[in-house]
Amino acid sequence: MMQICDSYNQKNSLFNAMNRFIGAVNNMDQTVMVPSLLRDVPLDQEEEKEVTSFQDGDMYGSYVLLKSIRNDIEWGVLQAEERRKEKHGVTTTSLEVSRIEPNDKDLEKLFHYHLSGLHTVLAKLTRKANTLTNRYKQEIGIGGCGN
């Protein structure tokens, strides 16, 4: 019984959610051989109905966004931000981030709130990567477009 419970909990772990997302994006990246074909291809009607903050209008924008998020997860947000600054000619010696420090009592509550949100976002991003992969296969006429 303990093994079943542990297996269920592991399936819902943050680590596994990130691995599912990274795997979906890697699959998308390996499938999409010509990303420029995604330009001006509208999102699914189902996708258009869904209100999200990362809609980019076409599949190419989603492709770029998903790869960017994968890189942020794999390499860290700070490294990605430093690469962007170097690319634009801005260099900084220290990261200046203004933060409001929460009370120690609020840390656990804050952690659970953000963890839950992260699980939700990762699940949506994983679905988006899988949908994009399948839509690309349809667009180029690959048979058997299932997962």
From Swiss-Prot:
| Keyword Nucleus carried by entry | yes
**GO MF annotation, one:** gamma-tubulin complex binding
Keyword list (alphabetical) reads: Cytoplasm, Cytoskeleton, Microtubule, Nucleus
Which cell locations does it reside in? Nucleus; Cytoplasm; Cytoplasm, Cytoskeleton
Note the InterPro entries from the entry. Answer: Lipogen_MT_Stabilize_sf, Spot_14
What's in the GO CC field? cytosol; microtubule; nucleus
A GO BP term, please?
Answer: epithelial tube formation
Major localisation: nucleus
- Family to which the UniProt record says this protein belongs: Belongs to the SPOT14 family.
Q: What is this protein called?
A: Mid1-interacting protein 1-B
Q: What is the name of the gene encoding this protein? A: mid1ip1b
